[in-house]
Amino acid sequence: MAPLSKALSVFMLMGITYAFNYDQPYRGQYHFSPQKNWMNDPNGLLYHNGTYHLFFQYNPGGIEWGNISWGHAISEDLTHWEEKPVALLARGFGSDVTEMYFSGSAVADVNNTSGFGKDGKTPLVAMYTSYYPVAQTLPSGQTVQEDQQSQSIAYSLDDGLTWTTYDAANPVIPNPPSPYEAEYQNFRDPFVFWHDESQKWVVVTSIAELHKLAIYTSDNLKDWKLVSEFGPYNAQGGVWECPGLVKLPLDSGNSTKWVITSGLNPGGPPGTVGSGTQYFVGEFDGTTFTPDADTVYPGNSTANWMDWGPDFYAAAGYNGLSLNDHVHIGWMNNWQYGANIPTYPWRSAMAIPRHMALKTIGSKATLVQQPQEAWSSISNKRPIYSRTFKTLSEGSTNTTTTGETFKVDLSFSAKSKASTFAIALRASANFTEQTLVGYDFAKQQIFLDRTHSGDVSFDETFASVYHGPLTPDSTGVVKLSIFVDRSSVEVFGGQGETTLTAQIFPSSDAVHARLASTGGTTEDVRADIYKIASTWN
């Protein structure tokens, strides 16, 4: 569909052409959000035939959680998205829903191991959690209990536009493994991928309340064998869900390691309330994941956090990309207040897609993330603001105007005399409304302060300050890249080893910024601000 000016897009619905406007207050201009209604976890991320598919948890009937189906959008560059019809519509939607389609993943079955392919067409196979709100006998003849969660599959022969559920045998993994059968209400979120070394399909799924992951293998995506378990380890403050398992390059060389990601709700990073995502680095032999010793901590609260902010959850990885091109997307919201954020007619957006790799930092294999969009198509190389300061005195610099959507590159010396250095963003003219992003030199921490960021009235925990550890680089320099949209701030620190993601809801005229050094001088400061255009234009 050809994009139109003024953030209007033309869509066909039931034979009627209409225009949709992506210019509402708080509507992200370079983050994906559905035209309308509720969205949560990214699902079925698949790169196939030059197209990035983004499926997502979606309520086709309203702006709150319910009627959970799979929405669908596609892109050629992870930047400009086209929303497609609902891919998997809750069974019975419009009357009595008997099955919802909870989170899952998708693969291209290029060798047609499933037998779903016809006439030379490669089947795309989605694996998802069937949630049954009522006890029933299914078309396959299987019986399920009220509120049961089971793993099912569906396939597409038209590159993901329409899907057929495998009713003859669904669910293909009906129950949690022994001895955890009692956990049938908390068995969900399968992540499936092809393991080339063993020539098997592998799926990892969550036994949520027990903080365990169950790993299965299959030859055909239909018949599954339990091969191992993982957990509990590290943070266990809430349920484990939305797991992932991916191989990543280490130090840009020939060596690799495997990474498990797992959502946690509640019990997110220190200082947050609600959900978060942790990760483990280790080895995977096709059946068993063995974590590295330095990725596991004593107790049940310390973790390797994928993001230290409050609004990055249910991160999922793309199938179909090469080892060096791995990309994850996270849900940019939080279960603590997600149903109450002040947006309309949609609720929730996705975070910027992130390129993932591992680097040895402080002798430890560490996840590093970089923002992955077609930046040259939406941002100029020439900054709208560029300043350097050999020494920035205590106090604030003159105000500059940024607009609502922009990127900030900041660097400064870790040997500065200041206690903190920060930039105030999305600020009102008198700076009574502002979001602060900065660095605490003594604690060696990034911080993001949204206590005065705009509308914080919808949840008592929203107005808060968040921190993430960041050691200066080998030259003693601290580097931050900050991406600001109409209702979000995403901070990438250092090489991407520390990120913080937070929603904000500022006034539309809060378009000012300034630098501030507190408790002394900040040395060798460079600040560049780049305008980012709307992807909907």
UniProtKB/Swiss-Prot annotation:
List of residues binding beta-D-fructose: 40-41, 57, 65, 103, 188-189, 241, 335
Reported function: Exo-inulinase involved in utilization of the plant storage polymer inulin, consisting of fructooligosaccharides with a degree of polymerization (DP) value from 2 to 60. Splits off terminal fructose units successively from the non-reducing end of the inulin molecule, and also hydrolyzes levan, stachyose and raffinose. Hydrolyzes both beta-2,1- as well as beta-2,6-fructosyl linkages in fructooligosaccharides.
GO terms classed as biological process: polysaccharide catabolic process; sucrose catabolic process
Key words of the record: Carbohydrate metabolism, Glycoprotein, Glycosidase, Hydrolase, Polysaccharide degradation, Secreted, Signal
Active-site residues annotated for this sequence: 41 (nucleophile), 241 (proton donor/acceptor)
Pfam families given in the database record: Glyco_hydro_32C, Glyco_hydro_32N
Name recorded for this polypeptide: Extracellular exo-inulinase
Source superkingdom: Eukaryota
EC number: 3.2.1.80
Glycan attachment points: 49, 67, 111-112, 254, 300, 398, 430
Catalytic activity: Hydrolysis of terminal, non-reducing (2->1)- and (2->6)-linked beta-D-fructofuranose residues in fructans
GO molecular function (one): fructan beta-fructosidase activity
Main location: secreted
Taxonomic lineage of the native organism: Eukaryota, Fungi, Dikarya, Ascomycota, Pezizomycotina
InterPro entries: ConA-like_dom_sf, Glyco_hydro_32, Glyco_hydro_32_AS, Glyco_hydro_32_C, Glyco_hydro_32_N, Glyco_hydro_beta-prop_sf
UniProt biotechnology annotation: Two major applications of exo-inulinases in industry can be improved with the increase in thermostability by the G388A mutation, namely the production of high-fructose syrup from inulin-containing plants and feed additives.
Secretion signal, residue range per the UniProt entry: 1-19
PROSITE patterns in the cross-refs: GLYCOSYL_HYDROL_F32
Subcellular location: Secreted
Organism of derivation: Aspergillus awamori
Similarity comment: Belongs to the glycosyl hydrolase 32 family.
A GO cellular component entry from the record: cytoplasm
Temperature behavior of the protein's activity: Optimum temperature is 60 degrees Celsius.
pH dependence (record): Optimum pH is 4.5.
